[in-house]
Structure formats: C-alpha cells, structure tokens
C-alpha cells in the first residue's frame, strides 16, 4: 500500500484549475489504487507562517531558548516534515502566479527545508534526506510557458525537490487557461489525460 500526499496552494478555492486537477488526480488514484491512503493539505485554506527573522532561528540547530512563537513554528515544521517523510507519492498543485509558485507553497518549502533533517551538507556537497519518493507536479498557467525562459516553476521545483532528495519528478501542465474557453477546456482535457498516464504507471 502506498501513501499519497496532495499539497494544494491555489488562492482561488473552487475556481482553481490546479485545484480541480488535484481533485481529479485523487479521484483517479482512489479508483486505480483503492487500498492506498491519501492525505490532502490545502496550504491556502490553512496557510503556514511566513519565515521571518524570529522564526528562522527556530529551524537552525541552537541551544538558545525558543520564544513561544518559535516553539510553535518548530513543532509545525516537525509535523510537516514527518508527514512528508511518511508518504510515498507527493502531488504538488503549483499554479503559476507572476511566473512562479504561490507564496503559500513557498512558505511550506521554507518550513520543510531544514539542514540536518531534510538535507545535510557533506564533504561531497549537499545530500537530500527525503528519499524513496515520487513527486507529481500539477501546474496550471494562464499563458504558454513550458520550456521557455518564463517558466520559473519547473526548474525551481526540480532543484528544490532534488536538493531534499526527491529526484523522481513528473510534470503535468495545463497551459493557456486565459486564452479563452476552448483553449482552457483543451488544456484541462490534455492535463487529465496526462494524469491518467501518471496514475496508471
């Protein structure tokens, strides 16, 4: 039995294209893998705190006493990392906002990227500690950006996920959503077909 973690990050709730694709992914996965467990974390509906000068001190190894706010941030970071490590398939709904991922998703990454916990530095360079996992990125965009300099999402996510140890990464794109109903419908249809292939693999 596999465990699937779905991370939503769109601020558009039910109107979100990436949210609809992640819901479709969950439906298809449950149909094809009924014994698997699925956890959905909505980072927009339940946002994690923004990393600031106070909170960053809680995530670095130190013997200094922590403030109550730092204690809460450290406990949440531990919870998020334990959840991430406990799942086999990580599905990230990553819509494009101004050429990059939503703030809500970046805030999550800032809480799970911890030296000595999800990665470590060695004589040969950094080593990811979140291993044996597969990631699926569902990325909706208003325009057409795939394989162009304006797509900052795919390179960033490959680097970040690889840095913490997740190197098996598949991307599903829904592009041209803002180009009109016909283009948007085709984008959704093509993305769902790609999801079907990922789920069946």
UniProtKB/Swiss-Prot annotation:
GO terms for molecular function: electron transfer activity; FMN binding; oxidoreductase activity, acting on NAD(P)H as acceptor; oxidoreductase activity, acting on NAD(P)H, quinone or similar compound as acceptor. It catalyses: 2 a quinone + NADH + H(+) = 2 a 1,4-benzosemiquinone + NAD(+); N,N-dimethyl-1,4-phenylenediamine + anthranilate + 2 NAD(+) = 2-(4-dimethylaminophenyl)diazenylbenzoate + 2 NADH + 2 H(+). InterPro entries: Flavodoxin_fold, Flavoprotein-like_sf, FMN-dep_NADH:Q_OxRdtase_AzoR1, NADH:quinone_OxRdtase_FMN_depd. Its EC number is 1.6.5.-, 1.7.1.17. Binds 1 FMN per subunit. SUPFAM superfamilies: Flavoproteins. Keywords: Flavoprotein, FMN, NAD, Oxidoreductase. Its cofactor is FMN. PANTHER family: FMN-DEPENDENT NADH-AZOREDUCTASE 1 (PTHR43741), FMN-DEPENDENT NADH:QUINONE OXIDOREDUCTASE (PTHR43741:SF2). HAMAP family: Azoreductase_type1. This is FMN-dependent NADH:quinone oxidoreductase. It comes from Citrobacter koseri (strain ATCC BAA-895 / CDC 4225-83 / SGSC4696). The gene is azoR.
């Amino acid at each position: 039995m596999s465990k699937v973690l779905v991370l939503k990050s769109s601020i558009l709730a039910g109107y979100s294209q990436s949210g609809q694709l992640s819901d479709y992914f969950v439906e298809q996965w449950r149909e094809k893998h009924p014994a698997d467990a699925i956890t959905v974390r909505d980072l927009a509906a339940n946002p994690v705190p923004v990393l600031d000068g106070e909170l960053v001190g809680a995530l670095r190894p130190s013997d200094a006493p922590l403030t109550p706010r730092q204690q809460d941030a450290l406990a949440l970071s531990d919870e998020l990392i334990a959840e991430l490590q406990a799942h086999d398939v990580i599905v990230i709904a990553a819509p494009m906002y101004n050429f990059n991922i939503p703030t809500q998703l970046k805030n999550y990454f800032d809480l799970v990227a911890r030296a000595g916990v999800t990665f470590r530095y060695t004589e040969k360079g950094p080593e990811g500690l979140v291993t044996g996992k597969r990631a699926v990125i569902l990325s909706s965009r208003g325009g057409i950006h795939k394989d162009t300099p304006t797509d900052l999402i795919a390179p960033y996510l490959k680097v970040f996920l690889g840095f913490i140890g997740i190197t098996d990464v598949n991307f599903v794109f829904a592009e041209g959503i803002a180009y009109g109903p016909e283009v948007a419908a085709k984008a959704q249809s093509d993305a769902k077909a790609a999801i079907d292939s990922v789920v069946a693999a």
